[in-house]
């Protein structure tokens, strides 16, 4: 399956949920997904398009746009294509459905993203602290408006 076929399948199946889909190279594609459809799209990617490996989940902060993005990199063992799937989230209440039930390894990725950006993954089985000390919880140190840098970073607390 090539990049164009994957894009056509995604946009055909989810015409209202997928936007700005494009091919960056023969092996890299990108798309935005409606935050309320992200889990369903991931289920389709895994079940129908053989995107069986979640490589990462992370966040990006855009304070000037008043939003965060949840970013998923998903690959396939059956075809040489990596998909970057992004979901825009409002900065004041960034939440999205967890994909742990689709990709088991999303567990720690989502925990880390929650801890560092404040993106809440609904229905995550155990959204508890992973890397930050207790007194930094809720400070979202990777957001661009974090005021604790450089004195309140984990590196300086050790």
Swiss-Prot record:
Q: Temperature-related activity notes?
A: Optimum temperature is 39 degrees Celsius.
Keywords from UniProt, A to Z, are:
Cell membrane, Electron transport, Membrane, Methanogenesis, Methanol utilization, Oxidoreductase, Transport
- Name the chemical reaction catalysed here: methanophenazine + reduced coenzyme F420-(gamma-L-Glu)(n) = dihydromethanophenazine + oxidized coenzyme F420-(gamma-L-Glu)(n) + H(+)
Subcellular location(s) per record = Cell membrane
List its EC numbers: 1.5.98.3
Q: Which InterPro entries does UniProt cross-reference here? A: Complex_I_30kDa_subunit-like (IPR053606), NADH_DH_suC (IPR010218), NADH_quin_OxRdtase_su_C/D-like (IPR037232), NADH_UbQ_OxRdtase_30kDa_su (IPR001268), NADH_UbQ_OxRdtase_CS (IPR020396)
GO CC, sorted alphabetically, is: plasma membrane
- A Pfam match: Complex1_30kDa
Provide the membrane topology annotation.
Answer: Peripheral membrane protein
Q: How does activity depend on pH?
A: Optimum pH is 8.5.
Record-linked Gene3D superfamilies: NADH:ubiquinone oxidoreductase, 30kDa subunit (3.30.460.80)
Q: Please name the GO terms of the biological process aspect recorded for this protein, alphabetically.
A: methanogenesis; methanol metabolic process
Offer an example of a GO molecular function term for this protein. Answer: reduced coenzyme F420 dehydrogenase activity
Q: How does it assemble?
A: The FPO complex is composed of at least 13 different subunits.
Q: What does this protein do?
A: Component of the F(420)H(2) dehydrogenase (FPO complex) which is part of the energy-conserving F(420)H(2):heterodisulfide oxidoreductase system. The membrane-bound electron transfer system of the complex plays an important role in the metabolism of methylotrophic methanogens when the organisms grow on methanol or methylamines. Catalyzes the oxidation of methanophenazine to dihydromethanophenazine. It shuttles electrons from F(420)H(2), via FAD and iron-sulfur (Fe-S) centers, to methanophenazine (an electron carrier in the membrane).
Q: What does the sequence similarity comment in the record state about its family? A: Belongs to the complex I 30 kDa subunit family.
Full protein name:
F(420)H(2) dehydrogenase subunit C
- Species source reads Methanosarcina mazei (strain ATCC BAA-159 / DSM 3647 / Goe1 / Go1 / JCM 11833 / OCM 88)
Origin organism lineage: Archaea, Methanobacteriati, Methanobacteriota, Stenosarchaea group, Methanomicrobia
């Amino acid at each position: 399956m090539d990049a164009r076929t994957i894009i056509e399948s995604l946009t055909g199946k989810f015409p209202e949920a997928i936007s700005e889909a494009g091919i960056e190279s023969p092996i890299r594609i990108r798309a935005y997904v409606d935050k309320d459809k992200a889990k369903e799209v991931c289920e389709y990617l895994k079940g129908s398009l053989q995107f069986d490996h979640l490589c990462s989940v992370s966040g990006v902060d855009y304070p000037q746009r008043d939003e965060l993005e949840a970013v998923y990199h998903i690959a396939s063992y059956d075809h040489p294509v990596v998909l970057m799937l992004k979901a825009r989230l409002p900065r004041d209440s960034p939440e999205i459905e967890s994909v742990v039930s689709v990709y088991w390894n999303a567990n720690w990725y989502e925990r880390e993203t929650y801890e560092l950006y404040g993106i809440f993954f609904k229905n995550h089985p155990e959204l508890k602290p992973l890397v930050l000390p207790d007194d930094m919880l809720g400070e979202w140190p990777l957001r661009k408006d974090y005021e604790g840098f450089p004195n309140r970073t984990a590196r300086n607390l050790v």
